[in-house]
Structures are given as structure tokens and as C-alpha cells.
């Protein structure tokens, strides 16, 4: 019976735009992609979207460290992330960024609606402030002991051990991650989302039965401990969206990050010229289904704040959250020193994407359990399942069909009942894919693969091929094997997209869920080519070694201008305003007798002359080349008496020194004496 086509919007949590994608990230994106591909095979309309989470202090500070703008950094990181996901065949319809016009407009819209509906509160709070860096410290830039479970080295917004959320001021023995200093308290006005007003709605949503049991149980604990108002603002300096009518105040990254789901979908609709789907999918009474695949570390934000924000701004809530656990490697947390902290791009340099997709899928269930990537078991399972059980089934039969029957399959099935057993399994396997019991689906498929190989073993086509007068039997046996292989690969298509493409080319037909009800009879297949290569532990060793080398390279001293000359301590605007910078014309320039470093410059400030000694001789061996050039000088620097005379200011130059000194010059049109602002 044909299913009624559903409209489904699927998202993965947004990767943060300050680091590379690693195998921990890939678990979620593979899980979601397998589910999405299955839904598409069943004829549903699926929009699969994601974006980079591109705001926050960490991005601002890292960009400063790299000597580039935050916009440049997040642009480069987004390209890298998209490349990695494409390499793993994650079939996104759109991959966007939270730093976008769509996201700004939607963030402001949701905030405005929440404010108009009375869900935004203002109050002055005491915040942790780094006295050495001169900045308020965001949650993730304070670490200390969790006030709930007493676990050490936890961030200032939530505990990675017990999952609790709290204010940074509640941390025990807090330290600034930026400088290591002990923060002090400073007052600042902040904006709060009134989460407790949605307690009744959230509890009803929890009791609806849609959420995973572990998620619902955890939410109940949070309800019992009482919901708190949520601070949604951050003080400048901050890379993000400024709050409307609140200069110097910015949306906290966790407010605009989930709105990024909406922003990415809006961007997709706009690119398609679709003016109706955004409203259709996000309106309060939408019939479309909305699913978020997320890790267990961000359940609090997605199960409480996000649905409450949507409810308070008159948008629909998620249909469900699909939560997964963490990834360990060889039974332990991913380790850079052991080479098991593996980037997605590094993996693809040593293995194909289908291998990891298969291994993760074989271990996943609908529960929030951690997944262990045991690299030795990985090699054994991929070889045993994909190579020996599935691909080998095709190679054992295709040769006879190609050589003896010109690639044409038999006109009838040798064992219709066996074929029916395979196609009847579609319901159970489909239900396993649907309910995200992926490991169960793989077990059932591999059990069928064992049956198929046992059939070939018993029929022994290599023996039949040598017996005269049994050509029809040989064709029937091998055609049966090929048809069983086709069914198996149809069931595996959501997991193994690259292998599936090769199989479709070999079988000369599309692998479709409904199509297996009609076996391939009298059908011509193409010549068999190797579909999948066996893997070995040498590849694993090379992968681990490469990961270790990447860590060494990353840990090497940073080079470049910022490494050689780090940015100085933050100053106030009032401090900066004391420095009077002026355009100056170099009227004369010459050597200083008795000094091999200095040049004597005579500067015209538009009516006033200054005499300045500058240590730029090594870069300008012919001082006459400077005459007539304009530069910038500090005009209000106290005169300095030197043995060569009095220096009445300082000219501005860049560079590390020696021959690499570069005198700064204003743009064309600037006039001597004009102030640099």
C-alpha cells in the first residue's frame, strides 16, 4: 500500500564556525542523512538543512588571533565544513550561516514578538569581568567547578557532566579562560527571556509521548528543580547581531543559533523562488513535520528554550528531537595525543565515506547511547559485511551472467518463495529505518545476506557451469543471486550512497523501495567491475599517524605578525582619544651623524614645523627618497631630548624591523596638519 507523502523538515545541530569537523560531528550528520535518504526513498518531500553557527566571543577572539576579520574566518570555515559534509555524501538541500540577512531578520522578529508579548525582562546584573583583558566574560570563557555536581573544569553556562545550566557567577572558583585571571564582578543591564512562563506548555509537550524517554525524564528533572529566566544578551565587544534599540547589547549566540534553522530554510525557499513554503512549514498549525537531530549535550537548549521561543513568537514547535550520544574511539574519549581525534577530512584521505557511514549505522539505535569506533572492529566489520557478504554476492554470480549469457538475466526466478522472503522483510527493515533503530536494520539485512550466500553455496554455480546441458540452470541460479543482491542493496541504499551508485550502474536500474516488488527478469546488466575494495589495518595506522602529525603541526608555535607582536592590553576609548595623530609632510630627511639607526626628519604640519628622529634608517638607506612624501605622526607626544637634539613627535611605521620597516602614508587627498580620526 502506498504511503501518504509527508512534508518533512530535518536539521542537524549547527557546527560552530571556529574549528574543523571531526568524527564526533559526523555521527549526527550521518545518522540524519541515513534517515533522510530513507524518507526520500519512500516518496516523502524532505528538506534537509543545516548552517554554520557563526557568532560569539570565541569566533571574535580567534579571528583576532589569526589577524583576520570574523567575517573572513567564518567564510573560510563554512567552505571547509561544506567540503567535509559533501565528502561524506551528506545530502543537504541547503547549508547556510547564522551570520546572514535571513537570520538577522528572523532573530529581530522573534525578539520583537517576545518583547511585545511581555516575555522579555530587563534588569541589572553583576557579571564576571576580566580585569586584565578589560572585557565581560561570556559563559564559555569562564571555567570552574559545577555548582550542582561539583565536577571541575566546567564552562560557565552548562555542565558537560550532569547537563545542568547555571549562571557563570554560580561557578565555584571561576577563572578567565582568556587570561587565567580571577574575574571580578561588574554591573551591566541585561535582557532575559521569561522561560518560567512556558513551564506548563513545556510539561504538556514533554508528556505528549513524542520525545525519547531519556529526554522526557531529564526534562522532568529540570521542571522539578524550577525553570529560570534566561539571559539572552551579551555586552560589546561581541560578534553577532545587535539587539534592536539597545546599543552595545548583542543577542547571545544561543538565541540566534536555533533560529538559524529557520534562516537556512528561508534562504533555501528564496533561492528556489518559493514564496509559500516557509510560512507553510513554520506557521503555528503547520501540517509539516519538523525534526532536529542533536547531541545529548544541547538537549536543554532545544527542549526548553527553543520550543518556548517559538511558542512565544507564534511559530510552530518541533515535532520531535532525535538525540544521540557521544563518539569514543577504541573505548576512550577521542585523544589528540593518541591520534584518535580524527578530522573528517583526514578520514577521507585514508578511507571512503561509505565505510564510516556503515559502521556508525550498524551501531546506532533510537536510544541516547555513546558509540564506540573501535578501529580494529571497524576493519573487520566492513570487510565481513560489505565486502564478503554483500559485494561478493554480486561478484560470485555476475561473471557467469556476463560471460555465458551476454549479461541477460533469466526470464523466471529460480526460487520465487525465497525472493518473497527477501521482499517481505521490507516492512520490518523500513520500520527500523523509520524508528532510527539502525543497528536492528543492519542486523536484519546481514541475516538476509547470509541466506543469499547460503543459497549460492548450496546451488554451487561454479560446479553447474562445468556440466553440459545445464546452461538454463546456471542462468537461473546466478540471476537469483543477482536479484537477491539487488534487494539487499536497495535496503542499504540510505547508508551506502557511493556503493549504491556503482551498483545501479552495474545492474542498469535504479534501486527503489517499491521497485524490488518486481524482480529483474530478462533484464540486461552491465559488465561487473570491482564495486568495493577490502580495507586493512595499515590504513588505520596511517590514519592515526596522520592525525598525530596534524596535532603536532597545530601545536607548533604560531608564526606571523600577531605571534611576533601580540595585540596589547585593551584600552578605553578615552585613553585612545588622548593620542593626537596628524598628517605630516616630510620636507627634509637626512642621516644623523653618530647614529647608524636614525634618520632626521623635518615635518610640516600645515604651518608648524617639527623635528623628529626616527629609527628607520635600515629600511631607507637613501633618505632623500622620503622627501615630499606624506606620513602620519603622533603630534602630542612629549618632546624627547636626545644627544643629537630634541625629537618633537613620532612617525608611524609598521613591520618587524631591519629592512622590513614600512612608513605609513595617508590616502591621496589628505593634507598636512589634518587629524587622523
UniProtKB/Swiss-Prot annotation:
Signal peptide: none
Catalytic reaction annotation: tRNA(Met) + L-methionine + ATP = L-methionyl-tRNA(Met) + AMP + diphosphate
Broadest EC class assigned to this enzyme: ligase
GO cellular component, one term: cytosol
UniProt keyword Kinase, yes or no: no
Pfam families with a match to the protein in the record: Anticodon_3, tRNA-synt_1g, tRNA_bind
Cited Gene3D superfamilies: HUPs, Isoleucyl-tRNA Synthetase, Domain 1, Methionyl-tRNA synthetase, Zn-domain, Nucleic acid-binding proteins
GO annotation terms (biological process): methionyl-tRNA aminoacylation
Binding site for ATP: 336
Designated name of the protein: Methionine--tRNA ligase
Gene: metG
Species name: Salmonella arizonae (strain ATCC BAA-731 / CDC346-86 / RSK2980)
Assembly behavior: Homodimer.
Sequence motif 'HIGH' region, location on chain: 15-25
Co-factor remark: Binds 1 zinc ion per subunit.
Cofactor: Zn(2+)
EC id: 6.1.1.10
Amino acid at each position: 500500500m502506498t504511503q501518504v507523502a509527508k512534508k518533512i523538515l530535518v536539521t542537524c545541530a549547527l557546527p560552530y564556525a571556529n574549528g574543523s569537523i571531526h568524527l564526533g560531528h559526523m555521527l549526527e550528520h550521518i545518522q540524519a542523512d541515513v534517515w533522510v535518504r530513507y524518507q526520500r526513498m519512500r516518496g516523502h518531500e524532505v528538506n534537509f538543512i543545516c548552517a554554520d553557527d557563526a557568532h560569539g566571543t570565541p569566533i571574535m577572539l580567534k579571528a583576532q588571533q589569526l589577524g583576520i576579520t570574523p567575517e573572513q574566518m567564518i567564510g573560510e570555515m563554512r567552505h571547509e565544513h561544506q567540503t567535509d559534509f559533501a565528502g561524506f555524501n551528506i545530502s543537504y538541500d541547503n547549508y547556510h550561516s547564522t551570520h546572514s540577512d535571513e537570520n538577522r531578520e528572523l532573530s529581530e522578529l522573534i525578539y520583537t514578538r517576545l518583547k511585545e508579548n511581555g516575555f522579555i525582562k530587563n534588569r541589572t546584573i553583576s557579571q564576571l569581568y576580566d580585569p586584565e583583558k578589560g572585557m565581560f566574560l561570556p559563559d564559555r570563557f569562564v571555567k570552574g567547578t559545577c555548582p550542582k555536581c561539583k565536577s571541575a573544569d566546567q564552562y560557565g553556562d552548562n555542565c558537560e557532566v550532569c547537563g545542568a545550566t547555571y549562571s557563570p557567577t554560580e561557578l565555584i572558583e571561576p577563572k578567565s579562560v582568556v587570561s587565567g585571571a580571577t574575574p571580578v564582578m561588574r554591573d551591566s543591564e541585561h535582557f532575559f527571556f521569561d522561560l518560567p512562563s512556558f513551564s506548563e506548555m513545556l510539561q504538556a509537550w514533554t508528556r505528549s509521548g513524542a520525545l525519547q524517554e531519556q529526554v522526557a525524564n531529564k526534562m522532568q528533572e529540570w521542571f522539578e528543580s524550577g525553570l529560570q529566566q534566561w539571559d539572552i544578551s551579551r555586552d560589546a565587544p561581541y560578534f553577532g547581531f545587535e539587539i534592536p534599540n539597545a546599543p552595545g547589547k548583542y543577542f547571545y549566540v544561543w538565541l540566534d543559533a536555533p533560529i538559524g534553522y529557520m534562516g537556512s530554510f528561508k534562504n533555501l525557499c528564496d533561492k528556489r523562488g518559493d514564496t509559500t513554503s516557509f510560512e507553510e512549514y513554520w506557521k503555528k498549525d503547520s501540517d509539516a513535520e519538523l525534526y532536529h537531530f542533536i547531541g545529548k549535550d544541547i538537549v536543554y537548549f532545544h527542549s526548553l528554550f527553543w520550543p518556548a521561543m517559538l511558542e512565544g513568537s507564534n511559530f510552530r514547535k518541533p515535532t520531535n528531537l532525535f538525540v544521540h550520544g557521544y563518539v569514543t574511539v577504541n573505548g576512550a574519549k577521542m585523544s589528540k595525543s593518541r591520534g584518535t581525534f580524527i578530522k573528517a577530512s583526514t578520514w577521507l584521505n585514508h578511507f571512503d565515506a561509505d565505510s564510516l557511514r556503515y559502521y556508525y549505522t550498524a551501531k546506532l539505535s533510537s536510544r541516547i547511547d555513546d558509540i564506540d569506533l573501535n578501529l580494529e572492529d571497524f576493519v573487520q566489520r566492513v570487510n565481513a559485511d560489505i565486502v564478503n557478504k554483500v559485494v561478493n554476492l554480486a561478484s560470485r554470480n555476475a561473471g557467469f551472467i556476463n560471460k555465458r549469457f551476454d549479461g541477460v538475466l533469466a526470464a523466471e526466478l529460480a526460487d520465487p518463495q525465497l525472493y518473497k522472503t527477501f521482499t517481505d522483510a521490507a516492512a520490518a527493515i523500513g520500520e527500523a529505518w523509520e524508528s532510527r533503530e539502525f543497528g536492528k536494520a543492519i542486523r536484519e539485512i546481514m541475516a538476509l545476506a547470509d541466506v543469499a550466500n547460503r543459497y549460492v553455496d548450496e546451488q554451487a554455480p561454479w560446479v553447474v557451469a562445468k556440466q553440459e546441458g545445464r546452461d538454463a540452470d546456471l542462468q537461473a541460479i546466478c540471476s537469483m543471486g543477482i536479484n537477491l543482491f539487488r534487494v539487499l542493496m536497495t535496503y542499504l541504499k540510505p547508508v551506502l550512497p557511493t556503493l549504491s551508485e556503482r551498483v545501479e550502474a552495474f545492474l542498469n536500474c535504479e534501486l527503489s523501495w517499491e521497485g524490488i516488488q518486481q524482480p529483474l527478469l530478462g533484464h540486461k546488466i552491465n559488465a561487473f567491475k570491482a564495486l568495493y575494495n577490502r580495507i586493512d589495518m595499515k590504513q588505520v595506522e596511517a590514519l592515526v599517524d596522520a592525525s598525530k602529525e596534524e596535532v603536532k603541526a597545530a601545536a607548533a608555535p604560531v608564526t606571523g605578525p600577531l605571534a611576533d607582536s601580540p595585540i596589547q592590553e585593551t584600552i578605553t576609548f578615552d585613553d585612545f582619544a588622548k593620542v593626537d595623530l596628524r598628517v605630516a609632510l616630510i620636507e627634509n630627511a637626512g642621516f644623523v651623524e653618530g647614529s647608524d639607526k636614525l634618520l632626521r626628519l623635518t615635518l610640516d604640519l600645515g604651518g608648524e614645523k617639527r623635528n623628529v628622529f626616527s629609527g628607520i634608517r635600515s629600511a631607507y638607506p637613501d633618505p632623500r627618497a622620503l622627501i615630499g612624501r606624506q606620513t602620519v605622526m603622533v603630534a602630542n607626544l612629549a618632546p624627547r631630548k636626545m644627544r643629537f637634539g630634541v625629537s618633537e613627535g613620532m612617525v608611524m611605521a609598521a613591520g618587524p624591523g631591519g629592512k622590513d620597516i614600512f612608513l605609513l602614508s595617508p590616502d591621496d587627498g589628505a593634507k598636512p596638519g589634518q587629524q587622523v580620526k
